[in-house]
């Protein structure tokens, strides 16, 4: 059991992302986790209602901001004013846009967070960097020329309990294996390939939980393939634990995926995982041990992996067992939060010791 660490730190988060998305969801989850440790926090973000409500419920100070590029300099002045008023120990910028808006003349260290292989041009005003995978940390070190400033900060897969849902809520039967996709509806995520797989797996049903620019295209594709009666597009959902609870398999068929927190969430929830050898999964998923991996865009291999799990309970149990071990080693909520707090403290100490 991880020892719970508390801290008197004061952190300002700048979050300029969309209202939905895996990285944006993790930002909110981490702010909640830090709040539970008693850390004082200020958040500057877009005023998405579910985000604003989460901060208000916890008494976290929130400043709304639009982060429009054409209004950048007035908003930078506002950010500077907020930081001077709140006097945080460290400013944590989540992803590209937030990092590009942070002013250059702050008296606090600035951390830029990478959920992917981002261009460092947006991180010019950051003193330190954090990547969610080992390879992203390598990328940061090489691109910045400052590998000692690049920290590893995994996301966590721990999910709070949600009100239960039933398959019938989505028009899906109880007597067929259910494959769950938690993903944006975007070409990068390989949703089209999963629909093609569904056409070859007539005894399985599919729950697609996500939103995005290609949603209507995928709905049309499901109709064209004749699988619409076995596929439910549920839109973006915040009750990930409840959805995983009704799933037999969790799938991540991405073409591009720097990590994919759903990997760790499936391990936490005890749901067998099928993924592609995208950058994140191939670093952390061991084929045949804690997940099944297929090559990117390899339809036959994806179909085979899904089909194997549908008929081989022993295989599923083995993946669940070892997935739980990987989760506990690297992606457990309390340990990930503790490591972040320790990293914050290290950055603050290094900054004020004169290391710039």
Q: Where do the PLM segments sit?
A:
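Short hydrophobic beta-strand element within catalytic cores of glycosyltransferases
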Residues: 44, 272-275, 285
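Aromatic "clamp/platform" in nucleotide-sugar-dependent glycosyltransferases that forms part
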Residues: 236, 255
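A conserved mid-protein helix/loop that constitutes part of the nucleotide-sugar donor-binding site
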Residues: 21-32, 177-200, 213-219, 300
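Conserved acidic donor-binding segment of nucleotide-sugar-dependent glycosyltransferases
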Residues: 287-288, 292-300, 308-313
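Short acidic/histidine- and often glycine-rich active-site loop of Leloir-type glycosyltransferases
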Residues: 121, 263-265, 278-293
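A short, well-ordered alpha-helix in the C-terminal region of glycosyltransferases
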Residues: 301, 308, 315-330, 336-342
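Donor nucleotide-sugar binding/catalytic pocket of nucleotide-sugar-dependent glycosyltransferases
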Residues: 63, 127-162
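Short His-centered aromatic/hydrophobic patch
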Residues: 71-75, 92-99, 114
């Amino acid at each position: 059991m991880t020892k719970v660490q508390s801290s008197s730190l004061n952190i300002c988060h700048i979050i300029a992302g969309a209202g939905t998305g895996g990285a944006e969801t993790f930002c909110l989850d981490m702010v909640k986790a830090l709040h539970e440790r008693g850390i004082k926090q200020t958040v500057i973000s877009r005023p998405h209602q579910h985000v604003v409500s989460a901060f208000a419920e916890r008494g976290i100070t929130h400043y709304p901001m639009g982060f429009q590029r054409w209004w950048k300099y007035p908003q930078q002045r506002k950010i500077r004013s907020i930081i001077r008023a709140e006097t945080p120990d460290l400013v944590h910028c989540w992803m590209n846009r937030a990092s590009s808006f942070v002013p250059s003349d702050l008296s606090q260290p600035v951390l830029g967070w990478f959920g992917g292989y981002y261009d460092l041009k947006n991180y010019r005003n950051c003193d330190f960097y954090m990547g969610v995978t080992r390879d992203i940390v390598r990328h940061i070190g090489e691109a910045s020329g400052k590998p000692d400033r690049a920290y590893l900060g995994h996301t966590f897969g721990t999910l709070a309990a949600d009100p239960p849902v039933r398959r019938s809520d989505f028009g899906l039967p109880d007597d067929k294996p259910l494959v769950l996709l938690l993903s944006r509806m975007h070409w990068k995520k390989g949703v089209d390939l999963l629909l093609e797989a569904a056409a070859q797996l007539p005894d399985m049903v599919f729950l697609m939980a996500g939103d995005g620019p290609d949603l209507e295209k995928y709905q049309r594709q499901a109709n064209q393939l004749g699988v619409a009666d076995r596929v439910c597009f549920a839109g973006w959902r915040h009750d990930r634990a409840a959805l995983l609870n009704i799933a037999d398999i969790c799938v991540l068929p991405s073409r591009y995926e720097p990590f994919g927190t759903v990997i760790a969430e499936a391990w936490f929830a005890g749901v067998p995982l099928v993924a592609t050898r995208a950058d994140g999964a191939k670093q952390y998923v061991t084929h045949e041990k804690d997940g099944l991996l297929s090559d990117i865009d390899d339809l036959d291999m994806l179909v085979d992996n899904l089909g194997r799990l549908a008929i081989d309970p022993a295989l599923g149990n083995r993946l669940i067992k070892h997935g739980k071990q990987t989760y506990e080693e690297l992606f457990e909520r309390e340990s990930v939060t503790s490591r972040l707090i320790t990293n914050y403290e290290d950055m603050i100490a290094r900054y004020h010791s004169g290391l710039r």
